[in-house]
């Protein structure tokens, strides 16, 4: 594996358990259901434009099923904004899930990457933000609409954009490695954050 680049990620849907003291540990899978499954939508139609979930449906699902809807609605709002900032256009209905345990909660983000870094991949987002599929065309008003779709206060959308821009830019140096790709991706994300700030100042 020395000559192969890879990313190792610890799974959040596995719990290490022991049947009895002294016995070997085993992994137990936590029950998870992606939003397509939860909404009864075929995985073949995971993109909104193909009949897949919309963000409005995703927020409604959390209001209905989450054990902590106020928290999870904001977490999903943050996830949408974060994906927008980094250029992850592939955040479709199968990339958001519910975890079922003692409580039903929005699962942590997974399958997250900056698809905007790859010119051959689609420029259209998997789900519309406030009626807009193309991330470069998203304006501040679209985040107002996004917050309203979430059932949150209208100003929260734009406020969280500002806050997450600051967070992303502040954390970026911590993520840089010697791998050349990380520098290129970081530059792209920084550019996207800068353009977003400029739009909000207009």
Q: Language-model segments: what does each one mean?
A:
Residues 1-93, 97-202:
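Anionic ligand-binding catalytic core segments
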């Amino acid at each position: 594996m020395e000559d192969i680049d890879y990313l190792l990620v610890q799974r959040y849907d596995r719990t290490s358990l022991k049947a009895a003291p002294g016995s070997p540990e085993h992994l137990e899978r936590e029950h998870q259901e992606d939003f397509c499954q939860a909404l009864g939508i075929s995985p073949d139609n995971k993109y909104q434009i193909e009949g897949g979930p919309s963000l409005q449906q995703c927020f409604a699902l959390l209001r209905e099923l989450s054990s902590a809807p106020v928290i999870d609605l904001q977490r999903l709002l943050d996830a949408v904004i974060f994906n927008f900032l980094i250029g992850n256009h592939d955040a479709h209905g199968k990339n958001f899930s519910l975890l079922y345990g003692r409580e039903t909660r929005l699962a942590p983000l997974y399958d997250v990457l900056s698809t905007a870094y790859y010119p051959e991949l689609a420029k259209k987002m998997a789900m519309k933000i406030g009626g807009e599929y193309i991330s470069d065309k998203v304006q501040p008003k679209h985040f107002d609409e996004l917050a309203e779709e979430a059932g949150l206060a209208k100003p929260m959308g734009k406020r969280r954009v500002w806050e997450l821009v600051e967070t992303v830019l502040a954390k970026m140096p911590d993520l840089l490695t010697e791998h050349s790709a990380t520098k290129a991706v970081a530059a792209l994300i920084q550019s996207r954050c800068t353009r977003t700030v400029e739009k909000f100042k207009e």
